[in-house]
Curated annotation (Swiss-Prot):
Family: Belongs to the tetrahydrofolate dehydrogenase/cyclohydrolase family.
Domain of life: Bacteria
Pathway assigned to this chain's UniProt record: One-carbon metabolism; tetrahydrofolate interconversion
Gene Ontology biological process terms, A to Z: L-histidine biosynthetic process; methionine biosynthetic process; purine nucleotide biosynthetic process; tetrahydrofolate interconversion
The species this protein was found in: Limosilactobacillus reuteri (strain DSM 20016) (Lactobacillus reuteri)
Name of the protein described by the UniProt record: Bifunctional protein FolD
């Protein structure tokens, strides 16, 4: 019988642990973890997602500051705000919501965030540590961190397994490649333009799809008994949310699969909150 990986339930468990830890930090050490969420523009989906993060932080007892800028904000203005947040002792974590308006360079903006406050784990210093599999305290991209947590929670063995990632983004695909490789999986990365993608995905014991293409992966693209992680979240013309995987068809072949919604999405926010607390702890305790 196929296991449906319940990201919503696991996220609830993580959030409960985070809330308890935040309360203990406040009571015993007078530490209040803080996050600043920065958004530029009026993309509806981004605004909703940003508001959800802000509200979740407040609910867990984290000090959350929402910095909203108009779509025509200059890069200099946004960089000046990030610099202020870098030096703000009440802020442990800085998140810049993407996508950004076209006049802003995501690489420049990301690199301006102090590595020690880079809650998305996208600063080159943090990415370099991840790819080098360095020990120590540094942030890791939240969605990949959440995926690894799900795999661990469901006792999915990665040692020596073939893992295929479809999607090469810096937010998901590339950090996940490093994490899976560090866990001793044999990892292949592909994209939508990969020749004979189906032949490749059918070799996967662990298949992770993050392309933003609704129902890209069909049952015929999946090896029987594979573990399928669907990172995509797409809204169809009828308003229905769907992933990058044809869930109903693929679940008949998979050993385990994440639904959309209720799979990876809740885990991303839960790990964002968890990592904000980590950053606060590391800042005060090294």
């Amino acid at each position: 019988m196929t296991t449906i990986i319940d990201g919503k339930a696991l996220a609830k468990k993580i959030n409960s642990q985070t809330k308890e830890l935040v309360a203990q930090l406040k009571e015993k050490q007078n530490i209040i973890p803080g996050i600043a969420v920065v958004i530029a523009g009026d993309d509806v989906a981004s605004l909703i997602y940003t508001r959800n993060k802000h509200n979740k932080a407040i609910k867990l007892g984290i000090n959350s500051v929402l910095k909203k800028f108009p779509a025509d904000v200059s890069q200099a203005e946004l960089l000046a705000e990030i610099e202020k947040l870098n030096h703000d002792d009440t802020i442990d974590a800085i998140l810049v919501q993407q996508p950004l308006p076209p006049q802003l360079d995501p690489e420049v903006i990301t690199n301006a965030i102090l590595p020690t406050k880079d809650v998305d784990g996208l600063n080159p210093l943090n990415l370099g540590k991840l790819f080098a599999n360095q020990h120590g305290n540094y942030p890791v991209a939240c969605t990949p961190r959440g995926i690894m947590r799900m795999l661990a929670e469901y006792n999915i063995d990665l040692q020596g397994k073939n893992a295929v990632i479809v999607g090469r983004s810096i937010l998901v695909g590339k950090p996940l490649l490093a994490l899976l490789n560090n866990a001793n999986a044999t990892v292949t990365m592909a994209g939508r333009s990969t020749g004979d993608l189906s032949a490749l995905t059918k070799t996967a014991d662990i298949l992770i799809v993050a392309t933003g293409v609704p129902n890209l992966i069909k049952a015929t693209d999946v090896k029987p008994g594979a573990v399928v992680i669907d990172v995509g979240i797409n809204r169809l013309s009828n308003g229905k949310l769907t992933g990058d995987v044809d869930f109903e068809a693929v679940k008949t072949k998979a050993q385990a699969i994440t639904p959309v919604p209720g799979g990876v999405g809740p885990m991303t926010i839960a790990t964002l909150m968890e990592q904000t607390v980590d950053l606060a702890w590391w800042r005060h305790h090294g």
